[in-house]
């Protein structure tokens, strides 16, 4: 059963599945679709061509699907797509995509987005991530699965953060962060392996050791980057835990943190 507070303003063209709850003074626009059992708190605003999946919890004052902060945007019907089972806390802002990007901003499943986080246009966020308070992504950023962003992390346009990576408090990410690695600092630098995150997600000691050797190959052995990359890609053909480096290196355009 859908429960809508009488003060909520919902366009008649919006589509709300069964079990959706909408709090007081929330505003939902005409091109919004919301999946079953999603709960939206008071004073939220959901606009644009926005599709939200099932079993999400969206807290008060979230702003989802507003136009991108891009001067080139001309009211094109770009999209925001949010998956299932996400927690989106207070004062978060997720913008629509742009026609000069991929045309949509996408968030996967089971993500935990804390208060005041910002996802700009054309960002792609995977599954099972954690964004601590005030983490912000500039446009066209890609974040992999199981990533943890420390509070006040800022990620520059077009950067890529690999699966299981982690950033420290107030990290300024201006280059790509490889999978499994930690990054810290105003101009983020490599800060070791996210070994605790790997253990919590079921990686064996042998697998963690293999990734640690990749870290040493990239940063501690004095090997030129292209040679180190080729060596890692060779190992990735036979070691499953290293397979994520294949896509990461193929898609990386800004170079990696050094």
From Swiss-Prot:
Lyase as UniProt keyword: no
Protein name: Acyl-[acyl-carrier-protein]--UDP-N-acetylglucosamine O-acyltransferase
Localization in the cell: Cytoplasm
Family under the similarity heading: Belongs to the transferase hexapeptide repeat family. LpxA subfamily.
Enzyme Commission code: 2.3.1.129
Role description: Involved in the biosynthesis of lipid A, a phosphorylated glycolipid that anchors the lipopolysaccharide to the outer membrane of the cell.
Gene: lpxA
Keywords: Acyltransferase, Cytoplasm, Lipid A biosynthesis, Lipid biosynthesis, Lipid metabolism, Repeat, Transferase
Keyword Nuclease among UniProt keywords: no
GO cellular component: cytoplasm; membrane
Description of how the protein assembles with itself and partners: Homotrimer.
Pathway noted in the entry: Glycolipid biosynthesis; lipid IV(A) biosynthesis; lipid IV(A) from (3R)-3-hydroxytetradecanoyl-[acyl-carrier-protein] and UDP-N-acetyl-alpha-D-glucosamine: step 1/6
Catalyzed reactions per annotation: a (3R)-hydroxyacyl-[ACP] + UDP-N-acetyl-alpha-D-glucosamine = a UDP-3-O-[(3R)-3-hydroxyacyl]-N-acetyl-alpha-D-glucosamine + holo-[ACP]
Classification via CDD domains: LbH_UDP-GlcNAc_AT
GO BP annotations, alphabetical order: lipid A biosynthetic process
Organism: Neisseria gonorrhoeae (strain ATCC 700825 / FA 1090)
Lineage: superkingdom: Bacteria
Record-level Gene Ontology MF annotations: acyl-[acyl-carrier-protein]-UDP-N-acetylglucosamine O-acyltransferase activity
């Amino acid at each position: 059963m859908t429960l809508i507070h009488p003060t909520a303003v919902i366009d008649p063209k919006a589509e709300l599945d069964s079990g959706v709850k909408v709090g007081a003074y929330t505003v939902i626009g005409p091109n919004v679709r919301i999946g079953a059992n999603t709960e939206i708190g008071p004073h939220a605003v959901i606009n644009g061509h926005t599709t939200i999946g099932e079993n999400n919890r969206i807290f008060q004052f979230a702003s989802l699907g507003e136009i991108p902060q891009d001067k080139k945007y001309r009211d094109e019907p770009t999209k925001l797509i949010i998956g299932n089972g996400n927690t989106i806390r207070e004062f978060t802002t997720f913008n629509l995509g742009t026609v000069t990007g991929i045309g949509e901003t996408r968030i996967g499943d089971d993500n935990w987005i804390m208060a005041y986080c910002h996802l700009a246009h054309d960002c792609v966020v995977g599954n099972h991530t954690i964004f601590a308070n005030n983490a912000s992504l500039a446009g066209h950023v890609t974040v992999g699965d199981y990533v943890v962003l420390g509070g006040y992390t800022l990620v520059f346009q077009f950067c890529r953060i690999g699966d299981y990576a982690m950033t420290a408090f107030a990290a300024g990410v201006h280059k790509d962060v490889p999978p499994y690695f930690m990054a810290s600092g105003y101009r983020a630098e490599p800060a070791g392996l996210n070994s605790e995150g790997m253990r919590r997600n079921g990686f064996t000691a042998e697998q963690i050791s293999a990734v640690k050797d990749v870290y040493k190959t990239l940063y501690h052995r004095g090997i030129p980057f292209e040679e180190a990359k080729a060596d890692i890609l060779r190992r990735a053909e036979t070691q499953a835990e290293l397979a994520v480096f294949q896509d990461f290196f193929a898609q990386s355009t800004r170079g990696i943190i050094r």
